[in-house]
Structure formats: C-alpha cells, structure tokens
C-alpha cells in the first residue's frame, strides 16, 4: 500500500476534469439516450454460467471455454474499434476484450455510453492476452444496470514530484454510512465479511454436530434479563403493554433445558441501550449455548477447541493479529481466578474484603467510584481498569464473587464465589460462561437481592422474573451455559480494531 498523502475529496485533485454534479448529469443523460435507443438500462435477467475466479482457476490454453459472466465495470480502456474493460463480480475481477466486429455495431455503440460502475453481462470464450492475462473475448454484450453515481476509484497523480492519491474511498465514517460503496471499492472489506460468514457457519456446524438444537426465542420480552444492561423499550398497542428488546436470551434458553432438551443454542440479535465505541454497538450478535449435565470446566475445553478451529479455518494457522499483538489460540489457555489476577497486576488482595475495604483499595489505586455501587461492581471496576487491558494472550478469568453473577451456581469449594469464567483475549472479553444456577430457592434469593440493588440506584441490576423461577421449580438438570459475542470474535479472528468493521451497517449518528 502506498504511503503517499491522500486527498479524499475529488475537488482536491489538482486538475479535476468535471465536478461530481456534472458527472451525475452526464450519466443521467446517457440513461436517457439508452432508453431513446430502445435499450432498457435495467433489464430483468442475465444467464450467468460462471464467475471470474472460476474462469481463472479452470483456464486452459488448449481448451478455451464458452462462458457467460457478469459484473461491475471497474476499468475501461477504449481503442477505437476495440476496447478492454475489467469487471468485478462477487469473487474477483476478470478482463473483457470487446471488439466491434464481434459484438456488432449496435452493441458497441451501447458500450460507448457506459461508465465505470455500470453492471454488464458478457458471453464469449476464454483466452490469454499477449501479456499473459486470462480474459474473456466477448461475442455478446449487455448492459444490466446503469450506475448514476460515479464509483470513487482511487487514482494517483504526481504533484511536485510526489504521488498524490485522490478519489479514494477511505474516510471511515463515510465507509460505514455507505457500506455498499465500501464493498465495491475495497476488496479487503468484502473479505472480512466473507470470513464472518465462515466463522458463524463453523460454529453452527460445530454445535449441531454435537446433537444440540438450534432454536429461536422472543426478541420482544415483557421482562428483560440474562445480563446486566439497560434495555430499549417499546409499546405493544394491541395489548397496551410495555415490552423490551432482549438484552440476552439466557432465561428463555434455560426454560428449554427445563423442557427436556439436552442442548440448545441460538444465534441472536441482542440490544443494549448503552454507549457506542470501538467495541460496543447497541445492536449486536451473540450465540448462547446451554448443555445439560455439564459444568463450566467442561465448557472451557469446548471454548478452547472451538476458537482454535475457527482461527485455523479463516487464517490457516493457530494465531491471529489483533490490536497490534500476535495472539496464539492453540490450547490450552491460561486460567486465573479474578482474585489472583487482581493481586498479580495490582498487588492488592480482594479476598474476604468488605465493601468499605474494597472502596479503600480502589481509592489507593486511584479509582473514583460512584458511591451507589456495590462490592461486585467495585471488583469489576478494579479488574476492568488494571487487569483486563493487560491480558493479551487468551486467559480464562474464573471464580467471580457471587454478587457479580446472580445466575451462576455457587462454587463447589470456595464460599462466596460462583463457577463462572470470562475469556479475555487482546485485553477484551470474548465470551462468558457459568455452571448454571438451578436451585430455584437460591435463584429467588439472588434475584431479590438484585431488586434491592435496583432500589439503591443500580439500573443494570436484574428484575425478578416469576415465570423463569416457576420453570426452575419444575427442575432443571445441571447445566453449563456459554455466551460468545460474534462481533468481538470476528474482530479477533480477522484482525479488525473496531466493531464497526465487522458489522455491515453499524449504528451512526444522523448525518
């Protein structure tokens, strides 16, 4: 990639040929001319038989193939009675050779009214040019869609002995707002989203191959729960009731375990009415998995295996680059309790400390805390500020205080703790897991304590869900649960530094 200075606006070009408005005006006129000539600028179909990649991969000098291919014009070189153009389809680019004598005068005249960005269909045969480029010699040529806006193809000019890039579509905010253009002109962006699809497909197949059932649960919920977060609210007119967009699907999936399924999972859109930054989007994708008769230790091994397989699938190796660090995802991952991690990175011991003592520790570390937050939140603040950013290689942080995890089963050997882990990679949480709490009496006590925290001003504390408690009272088997943020996982495995680079259409402020 060139290190030349970039000028993002075409008006910055030292000698622009025409303004953007003039370009669009000319394209509208070309559309009119095509229609007047009896040519539909937007026909209904074209029979495609192959792709650019398939043509190149299967090319043979001895056996030229008849092909029909379609794509967007990305470059044109006109030479009187013959022309070359490059078209781009979903798999790459291929050169087209267009000769007036072969396609006919009418088609060639149509071609003269075309621009970069127009979508065309070509039927012909494969050949290799004198320079060795595999190409398609056109016998038939058809316009499939007229582009009325110019595609921002990057160009270079030399100014005062220095290369200047202009018309490049590289402004991040503009790329996010007009992802459709971003995908056209930046092939690496398209590659990231193809990898995302592969990652999700691998995970879905991994879960299904174990016999677990993919399910769907409500997005609109009368009571939100399953995570500590603020919800989006809406109103159901017919029932005259307030509903919430789900913040997690945990409580409904556990109901299905009660109902007799041994394993269920769901790829879900969840919604949290919170801030937007490099790692958070209000609408995000996560997968949750619940497996009966398992615990969080078993789930750690599953996560190690799953992440390693996904990394090899998209990168062809055990490691990935993330936020400037090479991350090795070959199992086993390091395991560290949250108390041990805080002691290792701050020198402070949090075990057995009261809320007042934890506040003193936070103060000694230089943290300013909201006076309304409780012990669990204080520990979470200390961990998030002084420990999490330093955990670069994959690390399971385990055994959290009970207050931090009201839906997790109490630790089998450590009083006051629960069986929970978070996987931290590159200084960021990737997934969260519990040995799930299935004692309905203790679960009620935990949720009622959450209600008291809400009264103290914690608007992220959970609400008592009576129907969920009723389900537990019928009996839920021992169960391990897992939640993986798909967007974070894709960031990790594709080396992206912003969640907006792995979501097709991230939330943006109004233009």
UniProtKB/Swiss-Prot annotation:
Binding residues for Mg(2+) 1: 422, 429
GO MF annotation, one: tRNA binding
Subcellular location: Cytoplasm
Catalytic activity reported: tRNA(Lys) + L-lysine + ATP = L-lysyl-tRNA(Lys) + AMP + diphosphate
Name of the protein: Lysine--tRNA ligase
InterPro entries per record: Aa-tRNA-synt_II (IPR004364), aa-tRNA-synth_II (IPR006195), aa-tRNA-synth_II/BPL/LPL (IPR045864), Lys-tRNA-ligase_II (IPR002313), Lys-tRNA-ligase_II_N (IPR044136), Lys-tRNA-synth_II_C (IPR018149), NA-bd_OB-fold (IPR012340), NA-bd_OB_tRNA (IPR004365)
Any one GO CC term of the record: cytosol
Organism: Chlorobaculum tepidum (strain ATCC 49652 / DSM 12025 / NBRC 103806 / TLS)
Pfam family, one: tRNA_anti-codon
PANTHER family: LYSINE--TRNA LIGASE, CHLOROPLASTIC_MITOCHONDRIAL, LYSYL-TRNA SYNTHETASE
Family to which this protein belongs: Belongs to the class-II aminoacyl-tRNA synthetase family.
Cofactor: Mg(2+)
Binding annotation for Mg(2+) 2: 429
Record has Aminoacyl-tRNA synthetase as a keyword: yes
Keyword Protein biosynthesis attached: yes
EC number: 6.1.1.6
PROSITE patterns: AA_TRNA_LIGASE_II
Record keywords: Aminoacyl-tRNA synthetase, ATP-binding, Cytoplasm, Ligase, Magnesium, Metal-binding, Nucleotide-binding, Protein biosynthesis
GO biological process: lysyl-tRNA aminoacylation
Subunit note: Homodimer.
Cofactor note: Binds 3 Mg(2+) ions per subunit.
UniProt main location, coarse: cytoplasm
């Amino acid at each position: 990639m060139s290190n030349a200075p970039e000028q993002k606006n075409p008006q910055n070009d030292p000698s622009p040929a025409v303004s953007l408005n003039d370009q669009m005006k000319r394209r509208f006129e070309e559309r009119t001319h095509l229609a007047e000539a009896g040519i539909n600028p937007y026909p209904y179909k074209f029979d495609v038989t192959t792709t650019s990649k398939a043509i190149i991969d299967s090319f043979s000098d001895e056996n030229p193939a008849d092909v029909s291919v379609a794509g967007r014009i990305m470059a044109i070189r006109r030479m009187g009675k013959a022309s070359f153009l490059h078209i781009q389809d979903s798999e790459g680019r291929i050169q087209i050779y267009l000769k007036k004598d072969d396609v006919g005068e009418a088609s060639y005249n149509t071609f003269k009214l075309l621009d970069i960005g127009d979508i065309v269909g070509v039927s012909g045969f494969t050949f290799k040019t004198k320079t060795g480029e595999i190409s398609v010699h056109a016998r038939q040529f058809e316009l499939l869609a007229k582009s009325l806006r110019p595609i921002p193809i990057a160009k270079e000019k030399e100014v005062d002995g220095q290369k200047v890039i202009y018309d490049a579509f590289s402004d991040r905010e503009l790329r996010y707002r007009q992802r459709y253009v971003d995908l056209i002109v930046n092939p690496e962006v398209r590659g990231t989203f193809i990898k995302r699809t592969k990652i999700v497909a691998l995970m879905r197949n991994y879960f299904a191959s174990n016999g677990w059932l993919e399910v769907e649960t409500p997005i609109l919920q009368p009571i939100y729960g399953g995570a500590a977060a603020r919800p989006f609210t809406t109103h159901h007119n017919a029932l005259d009731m307030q509903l919430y967009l789900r913040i997690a699907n945990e409580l409904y999936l556990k109901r299905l375990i009660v109902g007799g399924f041994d394993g269920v999972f769901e790829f879900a859109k969840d919604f949290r009415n919170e801030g937007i930054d490099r790692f958070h989007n209000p609408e995000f994708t996560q997968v949750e998995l619940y497996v009966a008769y398992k615990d969080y230790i078993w789930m750690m091994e599953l996560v190690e295996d799953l992440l390693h397989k996904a990394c090899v699938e998209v990168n062809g190796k055990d490691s990935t680059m993330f936020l400037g660090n090479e991350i090795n995802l070959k199992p086993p991952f390091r395991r560290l309790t949250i108390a041990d991690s805080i002691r290792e990175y701050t020198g402070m011991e949090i075990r057995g400390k009261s809320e007042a003592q934890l506040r003193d520790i936070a103060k000694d570390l230089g943290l300013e805390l909201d006076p309304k937050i409780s012990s669990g939140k204080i520990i979470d603040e200390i961990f998030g500020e002084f420990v999490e950013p330093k955990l670069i290689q994959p690390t399971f942080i385990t055994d959290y205080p009970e207050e931090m995890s009201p839906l997790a089963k109490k630790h089998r050997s450590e009083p006051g703790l629960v069986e929970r882990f978070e996987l931290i990679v590159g200084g960021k949480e990737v997934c969260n897991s519990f040995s799930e709490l299935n004692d309905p009496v203790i679960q009620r006590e935990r949720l009622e304590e959450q209600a008291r925290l809400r009264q103290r001003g914690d608007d992220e504390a959970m609400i008592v869900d009576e129907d969920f408690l009723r389900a537990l009272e019928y009996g839920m088997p021992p169960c391990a649960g897992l939640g993986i943020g798909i967007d974070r996982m894709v960031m990790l495995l594709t080396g992206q530094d912003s969640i907006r680079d792995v979501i097709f259409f991230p939330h943006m402020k109004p233009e």
